[in-house]
Amino acid sequence: MTVALSNLPVLETERLILRAPCASDFPALAPFIMSDRSKYVGGGADKDETHAWRVLAILTGHWPLRGFGTFVLEDRKTGAPIGSAGPWYPAGWPEKELGWTIWTEEAEGKGFAYEAVLELRRHTYEDLGWTTAVSYIDPKNTRSIALAERLGCTLDPDAAGPDPDEPLLVYRHPSPEALA
């Protein structure tokens, strides 16, 4: 028996369908989590399928716990899941985050994360009523730093990160008013 999360939003952009994660995303997510490409988001070559499954379960479980969560980025042309992005706010975190990952090298550098985050930022401000959002980024993750800056985010050196033992850069997204 498969149980689906119902009544979750599905958003669309020119090239993407943004939807909640599901079990069929595992074959695309697992290789990413088990590679060094995911080292900035809790994965890495030392991780196994069990760890990757837990990541999928965490992404999925955030939805019923918070009423929002990370979306899977599905390529409209191929139907393939190519990444994830969206609102994220685990217990104990100082602020609500907009995060993103691209799962395959083939999908990197094509603007998919940018396209998704623009729509997801609109969604969080207009539909969820957020008034601010940050993105927590590892200082070595130059691609995500560049994307945050392209999105108009600014480094907020006074903002706290989620873990004092893991120093992350805090990039603040423009406010809804600044984007209007």
Locations of regions flagged by a protein language model:
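Active-site rim helix/loop that mediates acceptor-substrate recognition in acyltransferases
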Residues: 48-67, 76
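Acyl-donor (CoA/ACP) binding surface of acyl/acetyltransferases
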Residues: 1-45, 57, 70-180
